[in-house]
Amino acid sequence: MLNISIAIDGPAGAGKSTIAKIIGNKLNIMYINTGSMYRAVTLMALKNNIEPSDIESLKTLINSMDISFNGNNIIVNGKDLEEAIRMPIINNNVSKYAAVEEVRELLVSMQQNISQKYNVVMDGRDIGTVVLKDAPYKFFITASAEVRAKRRLKELKEKKINISFQDVLKEIKERDYIDSNRKVNPLKQSKDAILIDTSNFTIEEVVDKICSIIKRD
């Protein structure tokens, strides 16, 4: 399998990361969770008291970050940040930092460099429309806000994070609004992407559907 790239986009909590991860394993290609990269920038910015409006400090911060992946975990400057970037404070702030044009430009450049070197499956908000515009396989994964909130709540409870369903639903809806209405690279379905609503399907069913489309070619 040479020069394959798979773009998976969709809103928060649609299941795209889980789906992309399994597809990466099944097809033996590199999985890049671009959302983890924005979360890592958010974590480091908050730790360093850098506001989303402080563009120069954000650019300096990102240029100082050596980002890689170990399996499914994101490594920044040699440290595994996977657990830290899943905390509610990151959920509540990531869309603000991800909306900054200069942040997106720097991370998109990193993502495109990776895709030129490896066969990849990437998930995010702007993969099919910006990062991998020429990807032969594009999918837009979605589900109702309520279904996505239930899934996210289950994930958080498994991590012993106590939060109400209403708070998770509110956060999902707020992120949807910010992601879809930001000026730079908003969340939207690429015209040539296949739409899959996962509300009434299991993860396995969605993975099988996507893999059958890829293998068909």
UniProtKB/Swiss-Prot annotation:
DNA-binding recorded as keyword: no
InterPro entries: Cytidylate_kin, Cytidylate_kinase_dom, P-loop_NTPase
Sites where the protein binds ATP: G10, P11, A12, G13, A14, G15, K16, S17, T18
Keyword Nucleotide-binding: yes
Domain of life: Bacteria
GO terms under biological process: nucleobase-containing small molecule interconversion; pyrimidine nucleotide metabolic process
CDD domains, per database record: CMPK
Protein location: Cytoplasm
Gene3D superfamilies: P-loop containing nucleotide triphosphate hydrolases
Chief place where the protein resides: cytoplasm
GO molecular-function terms, A-Z: ATP binding; CMP kinase activity; dCMP kinase activity
PANTHER family: CYTIDYLATE KINASE, CYTIDYLATE KINASE/PANTOATE-BETA-ALANINE LIGASE
Designated name of the protein: Cytidylate kinase
Lineage: Bacteria, Bacillati, Bacillota, Clostridia, Eubacteriales
